[in-house]
Regions:
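Alpha-helical scaffold elements lining the catalytic groove of polysaccharide deacetylases
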Residues: 44-45, 79, 105-129, 148-162, ...
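Bacterial N-terminal signal peptides
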Residues: 10-21
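A short acidic, amphipathic alpha-helical/loop segment
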Residues: 85-86, 154-155, 242-243
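Active-site beta->alpha N-cap acidic-glycine motif
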Residues: 26-143, 148, 228, 246
Length: 307
């Protein structure tokens, strides 16, 4: 499901290198998390959702990654029944599932009552696949936590009553945006355009590393364990082996979501009885009057590529 712009994910549109001071990578931690299981975005001709799931799981296993949470929209299994096996594959691989709501509604554009119903509708599916495992993690669709402070606080109380924790996002590079153009380029058999996508995707990942690390150090004087937002798309599956190598080469170690969010930075995401904290690096930078790193335009026009 395609995302839309939001304060917390403004960095998703940064697919070129940022004009900020390059920070040399040291041994650093990152937790991969995956949204929109079991089906995300367009499929290239000849590829299935199961193919995508198998490639993602194989790449993570080959890299000896710890279990990565997949956040589920149950409606996708209903709309595309052939995608449903991806959920069992994910579990068979030892990877956990969390709640991304049933149909991906944006809390900022829906009533609390409607959004809560959609959240709870997803729970039987999660219980089916997770059993006694910890599925009480919520990834807000569109990362919308409520357009007002009052609404955000009310929803946090509701989530606390249902024993949820928030799966935060502290690094992202707009991976979702590459899946539709990839399907178009495959249909046109345009190898040159696909090669451009490959390069732009990896460049965007590098830019996001610099962007997030720059803000973390400006705010706190040091790195934190980052939580990376990814999507279960076909292009993501194509690129994952190279992406994992990129992070490793830049000094990152892979950890679980629980390990990353054990850092004090995330305490308000784990204990929803606490008052809401700034929900992004960007918001925290603005509140503290710090200068934001600059973000140039995309280096590739994803909307027109292979049209």
């Amino acid at each position: 499901m395609k995302l839309i712009p939001h304060l917390r994910i403004s960095l998703l549109f940064c697919a070129a290198l940022f004009t900020v001071t390059i920070i040399p990578a040291k041994s650093q931690q990152i937790a991969f998390t995956w949204d929109d299981l079991p089906a995300h975005s367009a499929l290239p001709i000849g590829e299935t959702r199961v193919d995508v799931g198998q490639k993602l799981i194989a790449a993570m296993k080959d890299a000896h990654m710890p279990p990565a949470y997949g956040f589920v929209n149950g409606v996708q299994a209903e709309r595309e029944p052939l995608s449903a096996p991806v959920l069992q594959m994910w579990r068979d691989a030892g990877f956990p599932l969390g709640n991304h709501t049933w149909s991906h509604p944006n809390l900022n554009q829906n009533t609390i009552e409607d959004w809560q119903l959609d959240l709870l509708k997803n729970e039987p599916l999660l219980m089916k696949y997770m059993g006694d495992g910890d599925w009480h993690w919520i990834r807000y669709p569109y990362l919308g936590e409520g357009e007002t402070a009052e609404k955000r606080a009310t929803v946090r109380k509701l989530l606390a009553q249902h024993e949820y924790k928030i799966a935060a996002v502290t690094m992202s590079f707009g991976d979702y945006a590459y899946n539709e153009p990839y399907a178009r380029c495959v249909a046109k058999n345009d190898a040159a355009a696909i090669a451009r996508l490959d390069t732009a995707y990896l460049d965007a990942a590098v830019a996001a590393i610099t962007y997030s690390r720059t803000m973390a150090r400006a705010l706190y004087g040091h790195d934190i364990p980052y939580v990376l937002l990814m999507h279960v798309g076909a292009f993501d599956a194509r690129m994952l082996p190279r992406l994992l190598k990129l992070y490793r080469n830049r000094g990152f170690n892979f950890v679980t979501l629980q390990q990353a969010e054990a850092d004090p930075f995330y305490k308000n995401d784990l204990d929803l009885a606490l008052s809401p904290a700034p929900d992004s690096f960007e918001e925290a930078m603005i509140m503290r009057g710090l200068q934001m790193p600059s973000r140039p335009a995309l280096s590739i026009d994803l909307d027109t590529l292979c049209r």
